UniProtKB/Swiss-Prot annotation:
GO terms for cellular component: small ribosomal subunit. The modification 3-methylthioaspartic acid is found at D102. Coiled coil: none annotated. It comes from the Bacteria. Belongs to the universal ribosomal protein uS12 family. The keyword Ribonucleoprotein applies. Residues 1-57 are annotated as: Disordered. NCBIfam families: rpsL_bact. With S4 and S5 plays an important role in translational accuracy. This is Small ribosomal subunit protein uS12. InterPro entries: NA-bd_OB-fold (IPR012340), Ribosomal_uS12 (IPR006032), Ribosomal_uS12_bac (IPR005679). Keywords: Methylation, Ribonucleoprotein, Ribosomal protein, RNA-binding, rRNA-binding, tRNA-binding. The lineage of its organism: Bacteria, Bacillati, Bacillota, Bacilli, Lactobacillales. Part of the 30S ribosomal subunit. Contacts proteins S8 and S17. May interact with IF1 in the 30S initiation complex.
Length: 137
């Protein structure tokens, strides 16, 4: 516990909160070739690698992921939600924030049904989260 004198000399500092999706807080000025402070809810990018990885203990699966070069020139790892996907290298994807708890280093999700990413086929429930169209009656 500091004394009053110590607090007078060096006051308490407010805690700085760190962003959970830092790539979303950076823009890029291609004319000046400089990064800018421009936060956005989604970012467009190009898939540079598509693959699977195994989750942390105690889970076991092959989770689909894509390495994406964003429009702000940052490269991030993003999760591909849903069953089956049509992504390959050079696919243009839309990213949103949101981590995957059992995949270390994966802080972003790919938006299904946007740009080159197809929605999940034969999806009846939670369709809006997976970009699936309403089935014909």
């Amino acid at each position: 516990m500091p004394t009053i004198n110590q607090l007078v000399r060096k006051p308490r500092r407010a805690q700085v909160t760190k962003s959970k999706s830092p790539a979303m807080n950076v823009g890029y000025n291609s004319r000046k070739k400089v990064q800018t402070k421009l936060a956005s809810p989604q970012k467009r990018g190009v898939a540079t690698r598509v693959g699977t990885m195994t989750p942390k203990k105690p889970n076991s699966a092959l989770r689909k992921f894509a390495r994406v070069r964003l429009s702000n020139l940052m490269e991030v790892t993003a999760y591909i939600p849903g069953i089956g996907h049509n992504l390959q290298e050079h696919s243009v994807v839309l990213l949103r924030g949101g981590r995957v708890k059992d995949l270390p280093g994966v802080r972003y999700h790919i938006v299904r049904g946007a740009l080159d990413t197809a929605g999940v086929a034969d999806r009846k429930q939670s369709r809006s989260k997976y970009g699936a169209k309403k089935p014909k009656a």
